[in-house]
Amino acid sequence: MLFRSLLDAKEYGVGKPVEFRWNQLLSFDACVQCGKCEAACPAFAAGQPLNPKKLIQDLVTGMVGGSDAAYAGSPTPGLPVGHHAGEPNRPIVSSLIEADTLWSCTTCRACVQECPMLIEHVDAIVDMRRNQTLVHGTVPGKGPEVLANLRETGTAGGYDKAARYDWAVDLNAPVAQPGKPVDVLLVAGEGAFDMRYQRTLRALVTVLNKAGVDYAVLGGDETDTGDVARRLGDEATFQQLARQLAGTLANLTFKRIVTADPHVMHSLRNEYRSLGTRYDVLHHTSFIADLVASGKLSPKAADALRDKRVTYHDPCYLGRYNGETDAPRKLLKSIGIQIVEMERNGKRGRCCGGGGGAPLTDIPGKQRIPDIRIADARAIGADVVAVGCPNCTAMLEGVVGPRPEVLDVAELVAAALE
């Protein structure tokens, strides 16, 4: 396995319009200002200072030179039109685009999903974040603390990594060992340190035990995948963490990785490939659905859910990023749940607000993104919101006031096996 030890010049991000790749600049110029990205953006809906349409138009303005005074669309929330200008070789932040605009993005890719011109808004935002982080060192909120924790401890919270699997001590979950092959390697992710999400992981292990799966947990050697570091623009820390975790995995023998965290799945399945690795990585809902389909699990309808209206919230990094929207629904159907869909679902599901490091940068708006998503669930009379991501669990459960119960799909399946 070969990793590059130094960042390329382009990996330090984009600080001026001229530093974007030519094909990015061409795509920005293709914008027809239809506003579909604006209508889909969760940050814009929450009143945070991000309008993806305005951002793209600002980048076009910056490349040709001039001000944003002629922009006729909806303004960026809280930022009046006519106060920003740019030039091809002039710094983007904050003459053309405010730093808070970049840090408001949850990287959910709803804008990209809707764009008829296939513009990659999120990639452009992360490019500009890299310049802010690696060149200027201006990550807001708790971002600097978390990045330091990741570099020093391999965990976002600065925890002792040996405690990552404390939740499994009474479950007889085997720990992966060099020289002991297993079919499935369970990678828990950062959610393992959260007491609420530990219930999800315990439910998942219970399901694996019930099905007789040959598995092992990664154990105390597990370190962060680097997802948050990359979203916050710290490419150097991402590559450091990727080398560390990939080195750990290289010492083990397994057929596939299963994880309950779509961010972990996306990093290992897709982003580590550029670093020279290839893993077969499954989300836990896909893996459990396969167990049910093969007859290794025979769940029954849970009595406690018989009269409940259940909806499913699609995690952005599972649905939009990796195209998996059917397996969780098939799995819920197999335990007798008839899903009541929210208006925005599947690949067009609304973001919970938990991705892209957004809870760390914490840019204020008029309301919270998870409040909007819970309002979607309330609108259809949902009693339970089924989820498949630790970030979604934390964000939706953090909504204040009466709300539907939030349960991971693994918890619902485990209840159906009792």
For the regions a language model picked out, list residue spans one by one.
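Acidic, Ser/Thr-rich low-complexity segments on the non-lumenal side of membrane proteins
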Residues: 5-45
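Short, surface-exposed amphipathic charged segments that create phosphate/polyanion-binding patches used
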Residues: 293-308, 353-359, 418
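Short cysteine clusters
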Residues: 31-37, 41, 55, 105-111, ...
